[in-house]
Every structure is written in structure tokens, then in C-alpha cells.
Amino acid sequence: MAFKKLLAVLTAALSLRAAQGAAVEKRATCSNGKVVPAASCCTWFNVLSDIQENLFNGGQCGAEAHESIRLVFHDAIAISPAMEPQASSVRGADGSIMIFDEIETNFHPNIGLDEIVRLQKPFVQKHGVTPGDFIAFAGAVALSNCPGAPQMNFFTGRAPATQPAPDGLVPEPFHSVDQIIDRVFDAGEFDELELVWMLSAHSVAAANDIDPNIQGLPFDSTPGIFDSQFFVETQLAGTGFTGGSNNQGEVSSPLPGEMRLQSDFLIARDARTACEWQSFVNNQSKLVSDFQFIFLALTQLGQDPDAMTDCSAVIPISKPAPNNTPGFSFFPPGMTMDDVEQACAETPFPTLSTLPGPATSVARIPPPPGA
């Protein structure tokens, strides 16, 4: 989405909040005493309690949270104005990946999402909410469970999808940078900088299906924290593979136990995106601000923001990220500036400290049940 469209989305959201704030009679007090912009938001507190206990294991930033965040992107990005009128009923963030899961979770880029869809479906049925709204809500709550994440926005009002999204709309890790930039521009006129913002989600992510023999390989050494360490470690020279070396979409990583996607490697080094990538290193405030912005835009792809209800008050506030160094980012033990493959020609790479101690392996994340 171009900046002017992103600004329009945010302006609409803020205008809606202002209108709701001015019309006091439209606000509601839920049974738990929380005041929300509309009575329809109250049901989401019940959903929140349920999924925190029974999906996210008491509010953890684990595999179920990671896959819920992934599901938001894979549902939303599957929209293509360029395919109109063939896909005229496909509305991006509409829950089609859950409604038509037997079709969409068999698409190659969606492999592995059938498990989180299976885990989420009973909550949709139990609470009587739409799949599109639930996917956005679960993703926002999942992020709130990860220390360092922004205060997430959540709007309701997504009608159920009436047809599955076409195949071929979700970027793959083996796609070229050109292909991925073109795909996100087609989906919502997102530019190359906003693509980098989206990939901030890989700060709290792991691969379950790139290597068929090993699941739960994190993309950075702090997969339970929403921080900029992902943007550091993707710029370090690769030294080996945790599993096999012939997996499509994987390149060598700098740390044992870590998975590096080919697409992340290339975007971190492409002239169009390298400086934006580097800009997140040691800059937690920018990371938080930009991701909050892009997450809202993704969850409203194909929707009319003016027709949606702001229920952001239901989303918990994340804990702050632990401050390992003054700026949050660091070099893993045994690594220094000499290991950086810097691609941004405009600004120097930030000065970072190296964590003390011997080099260690990144621990795997147990995948969701049934994965």
C-alpha cells in the first residue's frame, strides 16, 4: 500500500475512534468493567480469555502464537486487483483460508497452516465470530504475548469469504525480490519499504516445513521476543545449515539451530530494501511503530475501514522487550562487525556489543500439536 493509502487507512481509523469518543452514548461498559467503543466489542473479552488459556498456553509467545501471526499474512495477502474480475469476490483479510481450508492450506506456500487453522476453528464456532475477524484478533493477541511488540489494533466487521482465494498469491521464500515486491504491490500497493515492515513478523517466527526433517527452526536467536535481532542476524555471513543443505528457499545461516530464508537473505541485501532493513537495527521504537502501522493495513486489506468497529481496547498491552544492550540489538557470542555483510551504502552499520560467552545453538520451538 502506498504511503498515501496507508495514511488514509490510519486517518479513517483515527476518525472512527474520535467519532466514537464524541458519541458517548455509543460506548459500552462490558461485564468486566472495561469501557469499549461499541457493545459488540464486549464478546471479544470472552474470546480473549479463552484463547489465552486454551490456544496460547496461558499467554505464551510460542509456536501457536507464531503460526497465528503467519496466518494473518497468508489470509490477507491473497488478494489481487490485477486478477479482477476473476477474483472479484476475494477480499484479502476475509478468513477464506479457514472457510476453504481444504483448498487453501494445500497451496504450497500455505503448507503447515492446516494445524493452526484446525486449532483455531473451534473458537470461531464456539464464540460465533467470523473467521476473518478471528484470524485478525488471534494474530493481534499472539503478538501481544511477545515482549517488545507494539500495542496492536483490532477492528471487526469482516464478512465471511464466499470463495477461496486463488493459488499463487502468497510469496514463497524461493521467489526473487522482484517477484515479492511486485506481489505485495499488486495486493495493496505496498512499496518495497513496507515489505520490509511486514517482515518484522519474522522476529517472532520459526520454520516448520522448509526442512522436512526438522521443525521449529527460528529465524533469529530471540524468537520469543519482538525485537530487531532478526534484522541483525540476517545480515551476518552464513556458515552452515542446521539440517539438510538442499532445501528449496533456504540459505546458510550464521548460527546453529537457526533457519535463514532465501527471500530474507536477498531482501536484506537488495539495493532497494537494504537501508530500510538496516534501519531497524538498534531501533526498537521504529520497529514497533512501523509494524503496528503495517499490521493494521494488512488486516484491513480488501475491507472498508469506515464500516469496521474499533475493538482495539480488547487487545492486551505487551510487556517491554528485555534490554540486553542499550539499544536492544547485539552480536551473538563470538561474532563481531567483521561478520556483517552490509549492503546499505548510505549509512554505516550501527555499533553493537557482542554478548559474552561461548557460541551457542539456537533452541528449536516445539511446533503446534499435530504438526
UniProtKB/Swiss-Prot annotation:
Cofactor info, note text: Binds 2 calcium ions per subunit. Binds 1 heme b (iron(II)-protoporphyrin IX) group per subunit.
Listed pathway(s): Secondary metabolite metabolism; lignin degradation
Sites where a glycan is attached: N283
Binding annotation for Ca(2+) 2: S203, D220, T222, I225, D227
Region (Disordered): 349-371
E.C. numbers: 1.11.1.14
GO molecular function: diarylpropane peroxidase activity; heme binding; metal ion binding
Signal sequence range: 1-21
UniProt binding sites for Ca(2+) 1: D75, G92, D94, S96
Protein name: Ligninase LG5
